[in-house]
């Protein structure tokens, strides 16, 4: 069978389709349970052609999270601009969307997924990932009207990811946590994060 010649525009479209498929699958079923085969089949291409875009699954994961960042920021901006919501309600809803990413289409890595990805990233790729992560959380603080100092960004990153990771970890990764209280635990953490952001706004 003759090979199909793809233009640059075609390749960009296929690449975008791959990232969109990856994001949808990873948000719904997790990074670890999303296979390369599921992604290239969803985009309608072959396995061989897939690897001309992303040499490894880890390359795809990183690019998928980069693709997601503007969408996450846009979601926060839309909530802050919603006249029907108070500031606190908007922050709460945003954090809920992140913690329950399988419902809202936001991909979040579990502890194990983070560990596996970190082991396979080069030092340079890890630095780039952290820089983009910092930029995202800085943008979110700015969107929430909170001074985006380095200290604020670092704290907000950790407390937000803690809530997301804990929610994903109960009960499989954290079997001694009480699964019946998982949702109440997430709600408590979200309120605590909102309290912290209010203090940052009030006392810059």
Predicted regions and their residues:
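C-terminal peripheral helix-coil segments that are non-catalytic and often amphipathic
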Residues: 1-2, 135-146, 162-204
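Hydrophobic/aromatic residues within well-ordered alpha-helical segments
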Residues: 14, 57, 64, 68, ...
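Amphipathic alpha-helical segments used for helix-helix packing
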Residues: 89, 99-124, 138, 168-176
């Amino acid at each position: 069978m003759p090979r199909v010649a793809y233009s640059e525009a075609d390749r960009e479209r296929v690449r975008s389709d791959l990232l969109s498929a990856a994001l949808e699958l990873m948000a719904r079923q997790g990074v670890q349970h999303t296979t390369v085969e599921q992604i290239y089949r969803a985009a309608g291409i072959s396995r061989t052609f897939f690897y001309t875009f992303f040499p490894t699954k880890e390359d795809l994961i990183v690019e998928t999270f980069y693709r997601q960042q503007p969408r996450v920021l846009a979601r926060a901006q839309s909530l802050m601009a919603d006249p029907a919501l108070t500031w606190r309600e908007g922050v709460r809803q945003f954090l809920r969307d992140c913690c329950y990413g399988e419902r809202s289409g936001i991909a979040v890595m579990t502890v194990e997924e983070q560990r596996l990805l970190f082991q396979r990233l080069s030092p340079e790729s890890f630095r780039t990932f952290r820089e983009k992560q910092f930029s995202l959380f800085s943008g979110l603080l700015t969107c929430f009207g909170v001074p985006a100092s380095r200290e604020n960004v670092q704290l907000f990153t950790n407390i937000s990811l803690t809530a997301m990771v804990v929610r994903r970890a109960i009960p499989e990764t954290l079997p001694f946590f009480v699964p019946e209280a998982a949702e109440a635990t997430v709600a408590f953490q979200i309120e605590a994060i909102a309290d912290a952001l209010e203090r940052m706004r009030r006392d810059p």
